Design a protein with these regions (language model features):
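Repetitive beta-architecture junctions, highlighting loop-to-beta-strand starts
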Residues: 72-75, 122
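Beta-propeller fold detector
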Residues: 86-94, 136
Length: 136
């Protein structure tokens, strides 16, 4: 995995994604969001990348519980078969309820999440990418 300047075009706001919190279920976004029970799922970010030298993308969704509690982000890595996104790996990561901002980025071999907390240093979480594209 490596960062890239641009990513292949895809309709990220209107597609079906894996939901790693629901035992293999999926969630379908329409215009960038979906309602699952009382929860809301939103497209948060898309990051251009390359995987094994080919175009790829990292997509981040945020699931906000309707009954309160901390949100969870799903980070998913896609490669492309021609112009079609093919999912490789997905991971669910809880959001720190005290974070005022979250920024995702791609570095060689990993996806990074930087959380900004008031009065504290930023917290950086690193999610490694295995050879098959799954996330560690």
């Amino acid at each position: 995995l490596a960062p890239a300047a641009t990513t292949a075009a895809a309709d990220w706001a209107n597609r079906t994604y894996a939901d790693p919190t629901a035992g293999g279920a999926s969630v379908t976004l329409i215009n960038g969001s979906a309602t699952v029970g009382t929860d809301r799922v939103d497209l948060t970010d898309t990051l251009p990348a390359t995987f094994r030298g080919e175009p790829a993308a990292v997509v981040v969704l945020t699931r906000t519980p309707g009954n309160g509690g901390p949100a969870t982000q799903f980070v998913e890595l896609f490669r492309f078969d021609a112009a079609t996104p093919v999912p490789l790996g997905v991971k669910a990561v809880p959001l720190d309820p005290g974070a005022t901002a979250t920024k995702w980025s791609v570095e060689p071999g990993a996806i990074l999440r930087t959380a900004t907390l008031p009065g504290a240093p930023d917290v950086v979480s690193r999610y490694g990418v295995k050879a098959d594209g799954s996330l560690a």
